[in-house]
Amino acid sequence: MTEASARTIGPLPSRFSRDPKTPRSTDNAAAALLLAFTVLAILWANSPWAQSYSTFWDTHVAVSFGEYRAELSVKHLVNDGLMAFFFFIVGLEVKSEFVIGELTDRSRAAVPVVAAIAGLIVPAVIFLTFNPSGPDAQAWGVVISTDTAFLVGALAVIKPKFPARLRIFLLTLAVVDDVGALGAIALFYTDDLKLAPLAVAALLIAALAMVRRLPSLRGPAYAVLGFALWIALYLAHVHPTLAGVAVAVLIPVFTPERRQVEQTVDLVRAFRQSPNPQYARAVTRGLRESISINERLQTAVGPYVSFVVLPIFALANAGVHLDEQTITAAMSSTLTWGIVAGLVVGKFVGITAATALMSATGWGQLAPGLSLRRVAGGAALSGIGFTISLFIVDVAIEDPARQDEARVGVLIASVLAFTLSWALFRITDWISPPEPVGLTLVRPVDPERDHIRGDPDAPLVLVEYGDYECPFCGRATGAIDEVRTHFGDDLLYVWRHFPLERAHPRSFDAARASEGAAAQGKFFEMGRELFAHQDDLEWSDMYRYAVAIGLDIEQFDQDVRVHASKVLHRVRDDAQDAEVMDLNSTPTFFVNGKRHKGPWDAASLIRALEAGR
């Protein structure tokens, strides 16, 4: 299957809208770089040049404009300035997940969302049992966050079997975790508000909300207003990194629309035939605007955050001076052990218990192929709290010595969380190895129910899960005809519905129309019409196609509109089968009950079927 076809995703498009290998390797490299700079910071802070470490990061940088003057240390410039880009990327991901990603499907998202909330509350409660009062109690926010970059990288290092579903669960959990951590910063780690700059910030946020209506130059407008918002929040004594989140959540996100993509393709053809500046500008604009600015910014800014901002942040904040005095103080510090217990025990217990409760009560269900044992391993790994944890250490604790004790706690917790997760995955994979999902057809072919072409007793069976609005399914019809011609009576072909409504908004109605035609014995005839007119799938169009293939239009209307329950259940039953098998793109083929992996051109399908004789 091509990369483009993998983008045609339904309920959970963000999981599959990117190349499945590139982001994972990028995440791993980013986590490795973050770890390297963490080690470098520790070595630097404990080397003969340790004094230069603190001297450099404490160096002050000042900017003045008339009577206004802003002065920050290099460390605060990193934490307050550069880290705004980190929170900007987090905000973009959160917005994307809520609008077109994991969190759009409330039933699928319920378990990781509730687990994430428990993973925020339980660690804080455990920390406060160690530090119920005094200045250290203010550091409870250190234990609520999971470091997404380290989480993904550590999962790749541990290499549990079949990690795809677990990875999606943990990323969904991490999104909610980030929302909670950012909310904690806004609500509990901001004080001494200045109302005038805060009012200016509110006006800037309103202006940012209107930028989407501009016909052009939206990118520069977001940048200028975002920088102004950062300054306003800084002057208002609100943590200015929240400007990154505010800008991100106001940037629109959407899935590519097929019609707009096709219009851009037409412009490319026109440019090829007649290259000129006008067509070049139109093509550039069409390509740019067919993808949401949210996705474009994630792609453009994300690598700089992963490979520049976060390593610099680690270098600035992880330099714990591990002399005998610091280690001795940390080993006897309730602050240190409160952080360790909160992150390691709190995350593990909170996430695992909440998941078990949701599954047992039926309030939510785990995705196919994901068991409580797998979640437990991921929950342990969620105890790696680094980026935001170190960030809150600097915000919540004023005493440098206590900051070092807290950083030691974060480092110890990260090592213990990784070790615990590794042990859990190794033990559970050995005791009860997970099985891959979706490799076998979940429901056998039933000639009385399924839509079939060919002899029901044929030795070869090809099942397709498809979508009438999917252009790749439309192209596959020619391949299917070639395959059927090649095998003749030896092949039974079966069509099952898998309408990907989020990517193809008319696909479900098209499937209903085909079922209405099936009631009059013309299922495949209607399918031909639907594939031939994929850009015209309004109900008025489908009634025209019904007339064109000779249906009784009154009966068709009764079947699809008046007495629609049978039609609806039929389409949903097929779609639910696809969900159980964790299918994610169309077309998906099964050859003799086994999922076909790889290209689906006629030659490839013929080879796969021949191998099954």
Curated annotation (Swiss-Prot):
Topology with regard to the membrane?
Multi-pass membrane protein
Mind telling me which PROSITE patterns this protein's record contains? THIOREDOXIN_2
Q: Which UniProt keywords apply?
A: Antiport, Cell membrane, Ion transport, Membrane, Sodium, Sodium transport, Transmembrane, Transmembrane helix, Transport
Q: Which domain of life is it from?
A: Bacteria
Q: Where is the Thioredoxin domain?
A: 409-613
Tell me one GO biological process term: regulation of pH
Q: What residue ranges are annotated as transmembrane?
A: 29-49, 81-101, 110-130, 138-158, 168-188, 191-211, 231-251, 300-320, 337-357, 377-397, 408-428
Q: Where would you find this protein in the cell?
A: Cell membrane
* Primary localization class, coarse: membrane
Q: Where is this region: Na(+)/H(+) antiporter NhaA?
A: 1-408
Is Electron transport one of the keywords UniProt gives this record?
Answer: no
GO terms of molecular function: oxidoreductase activity; sodium:proton antiporter activity
Q: Name one Pfam family in it.
A: Na_H_antiport_1
Q: Which reaction does it catalyse?
A: Na(+)(in) + 2 H(+)(out) = Na(+)(out) + 2 H(+)(in)
Record-level GO cellular component terms: plasma membrane
Give the start-end ranges of region Disordered: 1-24
PANTHER family referenced in this protein's UniProt entry, alphabetically: NA(+)_H(+) ANTIPORTER NHAA (PTHR30341:SF0), SODIUM ION/PROTON ANTIPORTER NHAA-RELATED (PTHR30341)
Record function comment: Na(+)/H(+) antiporter that extrudes sodium in exchange for external protons.
Q: Which family does it belong to?
A: In the N-terminal section; belongs to the NhaA Na(+)/H(+) (TC 2.A.33) antiporter family.
- What is the official name of this protein in its record? Na(+)/H(+) antiporter NhaA 1
Organism of derivation: Mycobacterium sp. (strain JLS)
Gene field? nhaA1
